[in-house]
């Protein structure tokens, strides 16, 4: 019998994760845990002593969960981890805050430099973890430091430099759960900020399948190249496997056409990688995270 650590938050067993992902695919979490607060999370981790495997889960926007589900404990930080505070000319933002919500907060408070977040689905924690970026800006451009907890239950802080940000990644330890990000603040004009955000939203509407079941950019851009151009050159715009296809509108976006499985999506992505390599000699790297067990 599985004995779980005593917590104040909520456990659910065999919890279906499909409805939490943007692709609407995937299996169950063996254990799903939403901690009450940082202290509750630390207590769980200390009691667990790294015995049960741990997977962190954000907004589900840039992820494929395999159909066999996830062993161990899936930890999702809820609304209690989404606060936005303005202290000493810095923004302190909980990791479960949506990027869009932070962009809107900054616009309402005449804070510039966060406009690009309106075009990035997902949470602050996920954005930090992958150094997400769009429209000429990345998380590394605005972060001062990161507050996190490791799987042993130790609270840790990393400066921007210590985080080792790089294109769609960082050099942070892998056994971290990001709790907060601290951002520098530059004042701007609310109307100009709103204009830029509207420009970004309009561009997304015209060039990306934002109304479809998708996970955002499928592959990271190789240095000096565009993934969508390589995919298009290989003749894969609109290509379909099962219920999954490459978008006709933007062929670096995969779409669940309504009946796709996780296997359809992963098989399609692997097929695209193979064909692009055969056509251009370039090995595309997944930008979407794939986790879980095969059926």
UniProtKB/Swiss-Prot annotation:
**Signal peptide segment:** none
Which PROSITE patterns does the UniProt record give? Answer: FAD_PCMH
Q: What is its EC number?
A: 1.3.1.98
Keyword Cytoplasm on entry: yes
Pathway annotation: Cell wall biogenesis; peptidoglycan biosynthesis
Keywords noted in UniProt: Cell cycle, Cell division, Cell shape, Cell wall biogenesis/degradation, Cytoplasm, FAD, Flavoprotein, NADP, Oxidoreductase, Peptidoglycan synthesis
Which purpose does this protein serve, as stated in its record?
Answer: Cell wall formation.
Q: Would you tell me the protein name for this molecule?
A: UDP-N-acetylenolpyruvoylglucosamine reductase
- Record the organism: Rickettsia akari (strain Hartford)
Q: What is the lineage of its organism?
A: Bacteria, Pseudomonadati, Pseudomonadota, Alphaproteobacteria, Rickettsiales
